[in-house]
Amino acid sequence: MVDTQYMIEDPNVVGKNVTIEANGSIGQDTGSETFKLSELSPETDVDKILLIASAERDNLEIAEDGDTVTVHKREDVDIHADSITLKARDYIYLGGEEDINVNTVEAGEGQKITIAGAKGIYNVATEADHANVIGGDLVLEAADGSIGTEDKALNLKLADGAKVTARSQNDIFLNSTGGDLVAESLLAKDGVLSLTADGSLIAGTLKEGEIVNLQGQSIVVNAENVGDEDNYLTVALG
């Protein structure tokens, strides 16, 4: 599944060139809900099941009984613009029902960034080496488009050890500047997965084979090292 957004939302901000600076966060954490999986019915609890299914791994807590699940909910800011520049002291949750055209999205040091769009996520910066996304752990989702392009990858400048999760219906082109690219799970469903890193490309999972780290119709990697002798990357083609 590429699209984890099950509601269509009107944009919060519409413009040509949108710039937002926040002395806090952009988007918000909106509480949590706890469920017993054994008590959920596909006939009467569709919203709850969709909430669990669409949650990122780090938004889920599963109790030792294997039945109790807590979902931490997050609300993004939806923006429709030709160019988006965001800077926040804390985390950033950005969404959109059209293409998300990123100049710069910069969160606080080590803070999480989520960019989830109904279409594609693209680099619209005018400088070739401009860092588009700056922060900590990163989630990218392009439900019906690509992330970056062959001519203009999305440039990442993330904190040491920050993990990247990316899902795209088509292609993914990512360039990690100034360090390693830590791949939690990168899926280019119907296209090319192309990754460039100034440092190494390493798995973001604790155990090799725990999840598929890289998946696409074809995979291209340019990095100093690929994988680690203690934690191999898990790869799937097709």
Q: What role is predicted for each listed range?
A:
Residues 1-238:
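Extracellular lectin-like interaction modules
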